[in-house]
Amino acid sequence: MNTFSVSRLALALAFGVTLTACSSTPPDQRPSDQTAPGTSSRPILSAKEAQNFDAQHYFASLTPGAAAWNPSPITLPAQPDFVVGPAGTQGVTHTTIQAAVDAAIIKRTNKRQYIAVMPGEYQGTVYVPAAPGGITLYGTGEKPIDVKIGLSLDGGMSPADWRHDVNPRGKYMPGKPAWYMYDSCQSKRSDSIGVLCSAVFWSQNNGLQLQNLTIENTLGDSVDAGNHPAVALRTDGDQVQINNVNILGRQNTFFVTNSGVQNRLETNRQPRTLVTNSYIEGDVDIVSGRGAVVFDNTEFRVVNSRTQQEAYVFAPATLSNIYYGFLAVNSRFNAFGDGVAQLGRSLDVDANTNGQVVIRDSAINEGFNTAKPWADAVISNRPFAGNTGSVDDNDEIQRNLNDTNYNRMWEYNNRGVGSKVVAEAKK
């Protein structure tokens, strides 16, 4: 017997089985082939560099010596403080979410207030003001879609039209807790209300918790492919937790800001937000703003039914002297269309901005542009430039991850067709 021939046959058969197994494994389940330093169009972190980008770093305090925020899972009481649902239903304390929020704020307590929302559709805005204690708002249905908060608002609408849609029957009045929020928008003298006032759900509450519900700006595809900011959820507070929530819209679906009560971006605050087990949908600059936000086990879905030729997931407006902006880990990036969508771009609201984002340990599908995964900055039109650094004598990559001459948009250990690093032509 020719053992050599048998061995070769066995190896060939084994190799063939291996190839078959690999080819049948979906791309998003295969190991990542991203290697540092990547390219100037798609910079990739090394394992050593990636150690700097986890929740602990993003949730550090700007106050020297202060402990980092270490959020625990949201826990719900056996009996909430307030229940929102149909009139006459046993246990219901309020028929609108805003009325329940107002009642919780009026208590002026530093004790967390729990608001349970029964299944149903709740049309209209919800404003959660700053308060001594945190608010937990949660749906009691089996799924997030069972509780739906929605309204159609366009940042391009006039203040008069906005007042008509947002404040029917004196929902916001002087003396009510959220009046100052409403007044900061309704008193605008500009032609349009703007992105910051286009939010359906707006919170300035430190410690806000949202769970098991859906928030949607229903403007959707009723407008053209032009500039139509339409925020579903806006949060300004610190230590915000969002779990098992659908956030739906098109442009600027989820907007995080460090605005104070004057409703303006600030330079000395870094609000921190944790988003887990959630679903976020939109087309242009889906997640925007200024703050430290960690997304864990969250799906980002890009729809191109309105814009067709462009789509961006992240648009961070991180200050240049702040090292941490947005972090997505163990998440999924899905886009319709053939390589049109991009992972993000810096939202250059001023000369002190250099948006920061890291996508790591996540799956990116074929709907994303692999040749140019990151876009040029919005507003300033600053061309995207990733820092590939240099390699020292010990084969270690040397680069400043916060060099203001480069963008700060990074990836690490991602997989899927859309995660491919395309070689760049030598200049």
From Swiss-Prot:
Disulfide bonds: 185-197
Residues spanning the signal sequence: 1-21
Lipidated residues (N-palmitoyl cysteine): 22
Record's keyword annotation contains DNA-binding: no
UniProt keyword annotations, A-Z: Aspartyl esterase, Cell outer membrane, Disulfide bond, Hydrolase, Lipoprotein, Membrane, Palmitate, Signal
This enzyme's EC code(s): 3.1.2.-
Lipid-carrying residues in chain (S-diacylglycerol cysteine): 22
InterPro entries hit by this protein: Pectin_lyas_fold (IPR012334), Pectin_lyase_fold/virulence (IPR011050), Pectinesterase_Asp_AS (IPR033131), Pectinesterase_cat (IPR000070)
PANTHER family membership: ACYL-COA THIOESTER HYDROLASE YBHC-RELATED, PECTINESTERASE 53-RELATED
Protein name (record): Putative acyl-CoA thioester hydrolase YbhC
Organism: Escherichia coli (strain K12)
Lineage: Bacteria, Pseudomonadati, Pseudomonadota, Gammaproteobacteria, Enterobacterales
